[in-house]
Amino acid sequence: GYGADWRAAVSTTVATLPLGYADGIPRAVQGRGQVHLAGAMRPVAGRVSMDMLTVDVNEIADAAVGDEVVLIGAQGDGMIPCEELATRSHTITYEILSRLGSRVPRVFFEAGHITGHRNFGGGAA
């Protein structure tokens, strides 16, 4: 990423996610943020860029393009509440929610089932 701030201590596999601070992901999660991928918490690797962020997936042998990655919400038995992202970003929950950009699809769940979705900008919902 920008400035080569993050360097892997060992040979590492890194996943590139197609969202960044233009989508409302706080730049402050650099070095503090985590995502859920394949049932495991994985750290954000390096800086959050305008349109992408990178995640260390070294311990996930079968990580593949198209895998679901969760930044806010639940995956399997794991959960990343918005409050946690806000705390790691040194801000409040409402700032996180109000900054989510139009390119981020909204998916609505009730009792574990998708009840609707809304896409305000580019990308598929």
Predicted regions located by residue number:
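Active-site anion/phosphate-binding pocket segments in diverse small-molecule metabolic enzymes
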Residues: 1-125
